[in-house]
Structure formats: C-alpha cells, structure tokens
Amino acid sequence: MVITKKYLVFPVSDFVKVREIDFYNKDKLLDDIYIKLDYINPKYNIYYPVEKYKGMNIDVIIHPDIDFRWDQTDEPDYTFVYNCPFRPKLHFTAAFGWLNDPNGLFEYTSKVTGEKVYNMYFQYNPYGNIWGNIHWGHAVSKDLLHWEQKSSVLAPDELGMIFSGSAVVDSENRSGLKSGEEDVILIYYTAAGGTNKLSENKKFTQCIAYSNDCGRTFVKYKENPVIQNVGNDNRDPKVVWCEEMQCYVMALYLK
C-alpha cells in the first residue's frame, strides 16, 4: 500500500480482542501498534498518523491475520467525541483514548509574543481505551481550567514506549540545545524497552527530547539514551536545577 494521505483509518470497538498491527517498509519494521480492530461491527474510528511515510510502499501485517480494506484520510473526524454521555465537563479528558499520569507540567511566557501558556503532558494511548501504545499527549491552558488538546509530542520508537518523566525550562541554555528566540524546553522521560516489538529485548533507559517552539513539538536527542539501565523497572525521571550544587539533579523510581 502506497501512503498518499496523513492518516490510516482503523475501525475499532470495545468488544473484541486486541490485535497487533506491524508496519514494514520492505523488510524493515517501522512501527507496531495494538488496537481492538473491528471491521464487522465497529463503534468508532481511530486515526494512525502516516504523513512521515508519504510516498512509501508500506506493508501492514495484522496478528492474528484477517482480511481488511485500508482507508486513508487527511481529515480525522472527532466531531462526535465531546458529545458522548458521561464525559466529565470539569476534568480534562482527551478527545479519544486512555490517559494517565500528568507529566512535564510547566508554565511558559513566549519571548516573541508575550503569551503565557500552561502546558500539561500526560501518559496517553491514542488508539484505544486501555493501557498500551504509550505516547506523551499534550494539552494547553491559559487559566488552568479550560484545556485544549494538542497533537501528541512523543511516540514509541526502537527504545520503547514513552513512560513518565518531567520537563525543564532551560532558560540559561545550559544544554546548548537552544535555536531561535524562545527558551529551550527539555523533557526527561523513560524509554520503556521491551514494551513494544520495535524495542524487543531492550531495557528501560532515560532519554531527553527538546523543544524550541514553546513546547508544541519535540525532537528526541540524538545521543539517547542519556542514562542506561540502572536497575529493574528504573523509570519516571524527575529533574530539577539545584542552585546550591550548581547542577541538575535527577530522581528515579527504582524497584
């Protein structure tokens, strides 16, 4: 299948078993996701982003295998989601999917526009209402009450799913990663090796991603992981600047 649009459309429901879907270009595994695929009696659609594969010939392998017709679209339809019954009106909820721990909370005032925005990232499965496919979702607010969901900023890769962490506004550019007028934002997160097919037989490690556009998008640091595995289930880095020590300090959960 040649990718011509931004998203693949997967019909899903809550009443079938999870299937593994692998994406290959020739013999190279590009990604793997886990969804409740249901083309017989679907409840709604999910949209898998494939714009980065545009023009490529992608093989999509389903486990267990079923016959399926693939649809592509440039315009996801989430118009129904905020009208569904029982959705909370006060607490933040994602348009679709499963979410958990808030991560990397920070406030930032743009050096260019002067606009102050509160940023909240969170553990997020954009493809289903159960744990899995863990990304960092993103929402913003100007008053801490009204939140708007933005595009996810980190997706699973060959180091693993993207587990919890923290964010630092590097206003002094101690990292040297700043480019442009805005302060560079650093995210420290756990790459959960062994939690997806791409990261088979790898261990949990700690990684960095950085943003030069006020936290809207992030680039994964090319030297990741910055801390190798230091023990079973080491995860959830919290990083702060310690003025007395004149250095950053990281706390990790260890089991």
Predicted regions and their residues:
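Beta-rich carbohydrate-recognition and catalytic domains
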Residues: 2-237, 241-255
